[in-house]
Regions:
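A contiguous pocket-lining binding segment that forms or flanks enzyme active sites
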Residues: 33-77
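Short, well-ordered alpha-helical microsegments
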Residues: 1-3, 78-79
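Short, glycine/charge-rich flexible loops or terminal/linker lids adjacent to PRPP-binding catalytic cores
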Residues: 2-41, 49-55
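PRPP-dependent phosphoribosyltransferase catalytic core
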Residues: 58-133
Length: 133
Protein backbone atom coordinates (compact mmCIF):
# COMPACT_ATOMS: atom_id res chain seq x y z
CA UNK A 1 0.00 0.00 0.00
CA UNK A 2 2.86 2.47 0.66
CA UNK A 3 4.07 2.16 -2.92
CA UNK A 4 0.62 2.94 -4.29
CA UNK A 5 0.37 6.01 -2.05
CA UNK A 6 3.79 7.27 -3.12
CA UNK A 7 3.05 6.69 -6.81
CA UNK A 8 -0.29 8.48 -6.49
CA UNK A 9 1.24 11.45 -4.65
CA UNK A 10 3.97 11.80 -7.28
CA UNK A 11 1.64 11.06 -10.19
CA UNK A 12 3.86 8.17 -11.30
CA UNK A 13 2.97 4.66 -12.50
CA UNK A 14 2.66 1.88 -9.94
CA UNK A 15 3.40 -1.81 -10.29
CA UNK A 16 3.09 -4.60 -7.77
CA UNK A 17 5.61 -7.46 -7.58
CA UNK A 18 4.22 -10.70 -6.19
CA UNK A 19 6.40 -13.00 -4.11
CA UNK A 20 5.29 -15.89 -6.36
CA UNK A 21 3.51 -15.84 -9.72
CA UNK A 22 -0.26 -16.25 -9.72
CA UNK A 23 -1.31 -19.86 -10.28
CA UNK A 24 -4.11 -18.85 -12.65
CA UNK A 25 -4.76 -16.41 -15.47
CA UNK A 26 -1.59 -14.94 -16.96
CA UNK A 27 0.51 -16.14 -14.00
CA UNK A 28 2.12 -12.71 -13.75
CA UNK A 29 4.80 -11.98 -11.18
CA UNK A 30 4.52 -8.26 -11.86
CA UNK A 31 1.14 -6.55 -12.05
CA UNK A 32 0.90 -3.19 -13.77
CA UNK A 33 2.60 -1.49 -16.67
CA UNK A 34 6.35 -1.97 -16.65
CA UNK A 35 8.28 -1.28 -19.85
CA UNK A 36 11.94 -2.03 -20.57
CA UNK A 37 14.15 0.95 -19.86
CA UNK A 38 11.95 2.38 -17.10
CA UNK A 39 13.70 3.65 -13.97
CA UNK A 40 12.12 2.19 -10.84
CA UNK A 41 12.23 2.93 -7.13
CA UNK A 42 10.99 0.03 -5.00
CA UNK A 43 8.90 1.05 -1.98
CA UNK A 44 8.74 -1.26 1.05
CA UNK A 45 7.33 -0.99 4.54
CA UNK A 46 9.95 -3.09 6.38
CA UNK A 47 13.42 -4.40 5.62
CA UNK A 48 14.57 -7.33 7.73
CA UNK A 49 16.94 -9.61 5.79
CA UNK A 50 16.16 -7.96 2.47
CA UNK A 51 15.39 -11.28 0.82
CA UNK A 52 11.88 -10.63 -0.46
CA UNK A 53 12.68 -7.02 -1.35
CA UNK A 54 15.67 -8.03 -3.45
CA UNK A 55 13.63 -10.74 -5.20
CA UNK A 56 11.33 -7.94 -6.35
CA UNK A 57 14.38 -6.02 -7.59
CA UNK A 58 15.55 -9.09 -9.54
CA UNK A 59 12.11 -9.51 -11.15
CA UNK A 60 12.02 -5.85 -12.19
CA UNK A 61 15.54 -6.03 -13.61
CA UNK A 62 14.65 -9.20 -15.55
CA UNK A 63 11.90 -7.17 -17.21
CA UNK A 64 14.58 -4.78 -18.51
CA UNK A 65 14.10 -1.96 -16.03
CA UNK A 66 16.70 -0.09 -13.99
CA UNK A 67 16.16 -0.17 -10.22
CA UNK A 68 17.69 3.09 -9.03
CA UNK A 69 17.01 2.44 -5.35
CA UNK A 70 14.69 1.33 -2.63
CA UNK A 71 12.92 3.29 0.08
CA UNK A 72 11.38 1.76 3.18
CA UNK A 73 9.66 2.96 6.30
CA UNK A 74 11.85 0.90 8.65
CA UNK A 75 14.90 -1.34 8.77
CA UNK A 76 16.32 -3.47 11.54
CA UNK A 77 19.75 -2.83 10.01
CA UNK A 78 20.71 -6.50 10.11
CA UNK A 79 24.23 -6.98 8.71
CA UNK A 80 22.92 -9.67 6.33
CA UNK A 81 20.55 -7.13 4.77
CA UNK A 82 23.18 -4.41 4.50
CA UNK A 83 25.50 -6.84 2.69
CA UNK A 84 22.71 -8.10 0.41
CA UNK A 85 21.77 -4.57 -0.68
CA UNK A 86 25.41 -3.66 -1.26
CA UNK A 87 26.02 -6.85 -3.27
CA UNK A 88 22.87 -6.20 -5.34
CA UNK A 89 23.94 -2.58 -5.90
CA UNK A 90 20.64 -1.25 -4.60
CA UNK A 91 20.83 2.00 -2.61
CA UNK A 92 18.49 1.83 0.39
CA UNK A 93 16.99 4.82 2.19
CA UNK A 94 14.70 4.41 5.20
CA UNK A 95 12.54 6.78 7.19
CA UNK A 96 13.70 5.29 10.47
CA UNK A 97 15.66 2.35 11.83
CA UNK A 98 16.23 0.11 14.82
CA UNK A 99 18.64 2.48 16.56
CA UNK A 100 16.25 5.43 16.35
CA UNK A 101 13.32 3.41 17.65
CA UNK A 102 15.39 2.03 20.56
CA UNK A 103 16.59 5.52 21.48
CA UNK A 104 13.07 6.99 21.52
CA UNK A 105 11.61 3.98 23.34
CA UNK A 106 14.28 4.26 26.05
CA UNK A 107 14.08 8.04 26.34
CA UNK A 108 10.29 8.00 26.69
CA UNK A 109 10.31 5.19 29.25
CA UNK A 110 8.57 2.70 26.98
CA UNK A 111 11.44 0.28 27.62
CA UNK A 112 14.24 0.05 30.18
CA UNK A 113 18.00 -0.21 29.61
CA UNK A 114 17.82 -3.94 30.36
CA UNK A 115 15.27 -4.31 27.54
CA UNK A 116 17.63 -2.54 25.14
CA UNK A 117 20.42 -4.96 26.06
CA UNK A 118 18.12 -7.94 25.48
CA UNK A 119 16.88 -6.56 22.16
CA UNK A 120 20.44 -5.84 21.05
CA UNK A 121 21.38 -9.46 21.78
CA UNK A 122 18.37 -10.60 19.72
CA UNK A 123 19.41 -8.31 16.88
CA UNK A 124 22.87 -9.91 16.64
CA UNK A 125 21.37 -13.24 15.56
CA UNK A 126 17.56 -13.22 15.50
CA UNK A 127 17.29 -16.61 13.78
CA UNK A 128 19.02 -18.36 16.68
CA UNK A 129 18.18 -16.12 19.61
CA UNK A 130 16.49 -17.58 22.68
CA UNK A 131 15.04 -15.48 25.49
CA UNK A 132 16.67 -15.81 28.88
CA UNK A 133 19.95 -17.27 27.68
Amino acid sequence: PQGALVADALNLPFVYVRSTPKDHGLENLIEGELRPGMKVVVVEDLISTGGSSLKAVEAIRRDGCEVIGMVAAYTYGFPIAEKAFKDAKVPLVTLTNYEAVMEVALRTGYIEEEDVLTLNEWRKDPAHWEAGK
